[in-house]
Amino acid sequence: MDYMITTKHLTKKYKNFVSVNNVSLHIRKGSIYGFLGPNGAGKSTTMKMLLGLTAPTKGSFSIDGKHFPEDRMDILKEIGSFIEAPSFYANLTGRENLDVIRRILGLPKESVEDALQLVGLAEFGDRLAKKYSLGMKQRLGLAGALLGRPPVL
């Protein structure tokens, strides 16, 4: 079976509080998977661990056969993440903001134009991010997540 995401006994503790407790997942390639639960259930913490933003207290995970922490940078290239309130460099254009992400991920220059096209912002790419409407900022955040067309979104 080909799994895109595998976690084994993934756990995150903060002092005396267990945020994520012993989560083991096997998510197949091509599937749609989401986390549901009340506030404080560990949904965001699990996502932060999978993005490599916080390390698990115990357990392990892999994404597309790449293991954390040794393959952390390769894992980042496999995941497009879209947060609720994305932030941008206000003094840069939409295109320049995406180019910052592109360079960090080591993606080809064409990936910026591809992402702008995907979200319908190609004609606004040279506008300063601070001049974008709320909806345009949301689309720019989505374009950032789609840069390089990652296999995991």
What are these regions (language model features)?
Residues 3-7, 12-153:
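ABC transporter nucleotide-binding domains
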